[in-house]
């Protein structure tokens, strides 16, 4: 894949091929790590059901904490990639923006992971600790040939707008500079400004799905715009696992990301 030409680690390349579509060179990831931060949300009470639905819908990978492997494993062979999330923090904490490391790259390998992810809140009062973790874990990932996804979110006392193009661009660049292979961050809400974010980041960017949108059309149009602006995929949780038709919305996203179909055409995948 051309976007990974700068990666010389064969182990990383092999694993990246498992979570990126060969033809489109893009990915659809379904994060399911919300149980740690927010508790047993609707759509995640039985992770195996949700994993089955998104796999049937064509998602390239699911992302979650190591408990996802035990409670959400399909047992159907390799039909969907696995990304182990290494960071944790809860809404019950005095500082919800603080994320700590709760597992290791080696543990993720034992669990069969195709990649690991790390959460960094850029601008949080403890952001320097998360920067340190990202830098050190990127070295471990390099040693083991494990792709690293950095979730770079502008959040903190000085952040007035989490979608501000300048702060999103800074957050994305920061993640790439500290060693991440893939960046997950906010879509700015506008294709032109997001193009500038992409230009300023040497690592491919996957957009976050964000809070649940009012309509499917609104959400899918965001995905469409982001892909045309240079995004290399989408990582969407609540807009997928809390949907009435999890398989259908996953398939609709895949149609846009991998086949570049129009939103109206993609909406036909949703049956409920």
Swiss-Prot record:
List of catalytic residues: 33 (proton acceptor), 153 (proton donor), 184 (schiff-base intermediate with substrate)
EC number: 2.2.1.10
Catalyses which reaction(s): 1-deoxy-D-threo-hexo-2,5-diulose 6-phosphate + L-aspartate 4-semialdehyde = 2,3-dioxopropyl phosphate + 2-amino-2,3,7-trideoxy-D-lyxo-hept-6-ulosonate
Single GO molecular function: hydro-lyase activity
Disulfide bonds: none
GO biological process: amino acid biosynthetic process; aromatic amino acid family biosynthetic process
Keywords for this protein: Amino-acid biosynthesis, Aromatic amino acid biosynthesis, Schiff base, Transferase
Enzyme class: transferase
Sites where the protein binds 1-deoxy-D-threo-hexo-2,5-diulose 6-phosphate: 33-37, 153-155, 209-210, 237-238
Highest taxon above the source species: Archaea
CDD domains given in the database record: DhnA
Keyword presence, Transferase: yes
Assembly notes: Homodecamer.
Family the entry assigns: Belongs to the DeoC/FbaB aldolase family. ADHS subfamily.
HAMAP family from the UniProt entry: ADH_synthase
NCBIfam families: ADH_synth, PRK07226.1
Name the record gives this protein: 2-amino-3,7-dideoxy-D-threo-hept-6-ulosonate synthase
Species of provenance: Methanococcus maripaludis (strain C7 / ATCC BAA-1331)
Lineage of producing organism: Archaea, Methanobacteriati, Methanobacteriota, Methanomada group, Methanococci
